[in-house]
Amino acid sequence: MPELPEVETVRRGLADRLSLFEIERVEVCRSRAIASSGGVAAFLVGLTGARVGTWSRRGKYLMAALEPNRGIWGVHLRMTGQFQWIEEPSTPCTHTRVRFWNANGHELRFVDVRSFGEMWWVPPDVELTVGIPGLARLGPEPFSEAFSAPYLKRQLKNSSRPIKTALLDQALVAGVGNIYADESLFSAGIPPLTPAGRLTLAQLERLRSSLVEVLTTSIGAGGTTFSDFRDLEGVNGNYGGQAWVYRRGGEPCRRCGTIIRRDKLSGRSTHWCPTCQG
């Protein structure tokens, strides 16, 4: 699933490409892609004729302000959702779910192989967290002042769950997934199986700082591509080649030479170095 850096990369691409994009026509090819109240019919009414304004991101959610005063267009890519910018008319692929055109015939196409991606239209008189309920459950952004070592200490007090599992909890911190949980724990020198409640304030500060650094580096590299992720222009993310541990199970650690372990934790593959994180 695309995580914060990949979603931020998409947000930046959409902000560049769709500046003043006026939606002349919308086609929903798969109705389950529309998750908002009112379904496809309301979604079509809400977006058709609107001008796309500022794009924002909250965790793994994308949101565009629709102008003038037309509400919010929300998107979650889930496992395999991706946007494609099409300037010349072309036949959509089998996995095309939603299509948007402007008056010039340029198309924004939403393609989703696994079909878990979702879109919402939130009317201007509806609270955003009501229109997109998942937003209400999100914890602070990793780059925010609210995400601090004392915050983590309070939230994880007496918690026996592994710190890797805790980092995947979107209610603790928004936008982190398997890739950057593994990478930040390696950078902080913390074993992923450590009970979260046992971490000291100093360790939590190291983890916070490491997470911010790893996410910043990945955003600068355009995110990570291991399977389906592409940016708006179809370009792969480049962070994967820089990864210290993620998907490197059985290979030598780039830092110390110890073989990277790959364990299952809460059903997720977890990669770590027994020496650097010992």
UniProtKB/Swiss-Prot annotation:
<comment type="similarity">
    <text>Belongs to the FPG family.</text>
</comment>
<keyword id="KW-0238">DNA-binding</keyword>
<feature type="binding site">
    <location>
        <position position="95"/>
    </location>
    <ligand>
        <name>DNA</name>
    </ligand>
</feature>
<dbReference type="InterPro" id="IPR010663">
    <property type="entry name" value="Znf_FPG/IleRS"/>
</dbReference>
<keyword id="KW-0456">Lyase</keyword>
<dbReference type="InterPro" id="IPR015886">
    <property type="entry name" value="DNA_glyclase/AP_lyase_DNA-bd"/>
</dbReference>
<feature type="active site" description="Proton donor">
    <location>
        <position position="3"/>
    </location>
</feature>
<dbReference type="GO" id="GO:0034039">
    <property type="term" value="F:8-oxo-7,8-dihydroguanine DNA N-glycosylase activity"/>
</dbReference>
<keyword id="KW-0479">Metal-binding</keyword>
<keyword id="KW-0862">Zinc</keyword>
<feature type="active site" description="Proton donor; for beta-elimination activity">
    <location>
        <position position="60"/>
    </location>
</feature>
<feature type="active site" description="Schiff-base intermediate with DNA">
    <location>
        <position position="2"/>
    </location>
</feature>
<dbReference type="Pfam" id="PF06827">
    <property type="entry name" value="zf-FPG_IleRS"/>
</dbReference>
<dbReference type="Pfam" id="PF06831">
    <property type="entry name" value="H2TH"/>
</dbReference>
<feature type="zinc finger region" description="FPG-type">
    <location>
        <begin position="244"/>
        <end position="278"/>
    </location>
</feature>
<keyword id="KW-0511">Multifunctional enzyme</keyword>
<dbReference type="GO" id="GO:0006284">
    <property type="term" value="P:base-excision repair"/>
</dbReference>
<dbReference type="GO" id="GO:0140078">
    <property type="term" value="F:class I DNA-(apurinic or apyrimidinic site) endonuclease activity"/>
</dbReference>
<dbReference type="InterPro" id="IPR020629">
    <property type="entry name" value="Formamido-pyr_DNA_Glyclase"/>
</dbReference>
<protein>
    <recommendedName>
        <fullName>Formamidopyrimidine-DNA glycosylase</fullName>
        <ecNumber>3.2.2.23</ecNumber>
        <ecNumber>4.2.99.18</ecNumber>
    </recommendedName>
</protein>
<keyword id="KW-0326">Glycosidase</keyword>
<comment type="subunit">
    <text>Monomer.</text>
</comment>
<keyword id="KW-0227">DNA damage</keyword>
<dbReference type="InterPro" id="IPR012319">
    <property type="entry name" value="FPG_cat"/>
</dbReference>
<dbReference type="Pfam" id="PF01149">
    <property type="entry name" value="Fapy_DNA_glyco"/>
</dbReference>
<feature type="binding site">
    <location>
        <position position="114"/>
    </location>
    <ligand>
        <name>DNA</name>
    </ligand>
</feature>
<dbReference type="InterPro" id="IPR000214">
    <property type="entry name" value="Znf_DNA_glyclase/AP_lyase"/>
</dbReference>
<dbReference type="InterPro" id="IPR010979">
    <property type="entry name" value="Ribosomal_uS13-like_H2TH"/>
</dbReference>
<feature type="active site" description="Proton donor; for delta-elimination activity">
    <location>
        <position position="268"/>
    </location>
</feature>
<keyword id="KW-0863">Zinc-finger</keyword>
<dbReference type="GO" id="GO:0003684">
    <property type="term" value="F:damaged DNA binding"/>
</dbReference>
<comment type="function">
    <text>Involved in base excision repair of DNA damaged by oxidation or by mutagenic agents. Acts as a DNA glycosylase that recognizes and removes damaged bases. Has a preference for oxidized purines, such as 7,8-dihydro-8-oxoguanine (8-oxoG). Has AP (apurinic/apyrimidinic) lyase activity and introduces nicks in the DNA strand. Cleaves the DNA backbone by beta-delta elimination to generate a single-strand break at the site of the removed base with both 3'- and 5'-phosphates.</text>
</comment>
<dbReference type="InterPro" id="IPR035937">
    <property type="entry name" value="MutM-like_N-ter"/>
</dbReference>
<dbReference type="GO" id="GO:0008270">
    <property type="term" value="F:zinc ion binding"/>
</dbReference>
<keyword id="KW-0234">DNA repair</keyword>
<dbReference type="InterPro" id="IPR015887">
    <property type="entry name" value="DNA_glyclase_Znf_dom_DNA_BS"/>
</dbReference>
<keyword id="KW-0378">Hydrolase</keyword>
